[in-house]
């Protein structure tokens, strides 16, 4: 039976969620439920607007699941990209860490206490969506700087949803109750040094060949023959084709588009740009096909994959943005 709006617990939960969403404005939010005992995910993925998430029936549904042992997680959603918010999981942290973040211009827009001595901070670093490789690099830097959990430092990691209890057995009191996930700080806005964080990450990932046009390929980070084998490149490329059912869906495929999809996918998985280029060079069917300047084509394809035009993201197969990790 769904809890009514007169239930004081529901009202407190709604207030907490409203504060959290106000600190992290976005069009859609991914909500994920993970069972504290079995560690399995609740069937289905839920993408809700702020209004939908704050609906009394939605809140009632989530509260019932929480009482049944499900932990609630959320992330601002941007399909196959990061929405501009980075999670820093601060295990065994105190307020001094948050103050240090502020002194360095990495002001969190939201800080949660997930249990006594355990904090999660969200840092707003971009008003536009970020490529996975860029967001992951920013997350790793913040985790290193402030002692965050490196296992949580990636572009798609979800954080706790305020207003519910932490159902982990290790966090429960002697009486068996889970601690409430509480908001310590909530204030929307970009971190003052957000631009520097993103720029640093972009420099880390920007293909070296973009810096100069006159250097020899071996000086530009071009993959050597030993960097990746023909069999490895072919296996990687064919795996992408099979998972996306390219041959069944497109006859014949536009290989330049498939190359771009493969490059974006591999970059999002953390593969260095030179190795991505090698996969395309060795694994793309009949390469170099009719390209007059094959090396320039590879340069431009990987650069476009890493830094899509500002006018909008390049479409990718749905399989690339359906996965979300804990």
Describe the residue ranges of each PLM region:
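Signature for HUH/AEP ssDNA processing cores
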Residues: 1-119, 124-137, 141-144, 216-224, ...
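Residues that form or immediately flank small-molecule/cofactor binding pockets and catalytic motifs
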Residues: 35, 116, 163-166, 188
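A generic structural signal for well-ordered coil/turn residues at beta-strand boundaries
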Residues: 82-84, 154-157
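Modules that initiate DNA replication and primer synthesis
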Residues: 89-90, 116-141, 165-169, 203-325
